[in-house]
Amino acid sequence: MAFDGTWKVDRNENYEKFMEKMGINVVKRKLGAHDNLKLTITQEGNKFTVKESSNFRNIDVVFELGVDFAYSLADGTELTGTWTMEGNKLVGKFKRVDNGKELIAVREISGNELIQTYTYEGVEAKRIFKKE
């Protein structure tokens, strides 16, 4: 499938502002912007496995399209929600457990790049990954 493969973060757009809006402190924002995140994505039908490895943690996230699941961000923020496929995009709609506010994440492929767009409280950020 299109998302399958290993993707290494190449650059960010407005990511620190996004993290600030999320309430992440300045030290964690600086570190988070340079986390060397790598995603290894495997799709089997409607089931996805995403291995996240960074300077801070290594975790496996397993989800099925349309099925609610819980997820914790690297800073400990807890979310619940679902991923769905909308055309050629993976769209994640999540709610923060602590305040009920919505976080939207969209993953799409453009050439040899995976573009991950986040939207929270009107602030949009992108993380662009290159396929290894």
From Swiss-Prot:
Belongs to the calycin superfamily. Fatty-acid binding protein (FABP) family. Changing G66V: Large reduction in stability. Induction: By peptide YY. This is Fatty acid-binding protein, intestinal. CDD domains: FABP2. FABPs are thought to play a role in the intracellular transport of long-chain fatty acids and their acyl-CoA esters. FABP2 is probably involved in triglyceride-rich lipoprotein synthesis. Binds saturated long-chain fatty acids with a high affinity, but binds with a lower affinity to unsaturated long-chain fatty acids. FABP2 may also help maintain energy homeostasis by functioning as a lipid sensor. GO terms for biological process: fatty acid metabolic process; fatty acid transport; intestinal absorption; intestinal lipid absorption; long-chain fatty acid transport.
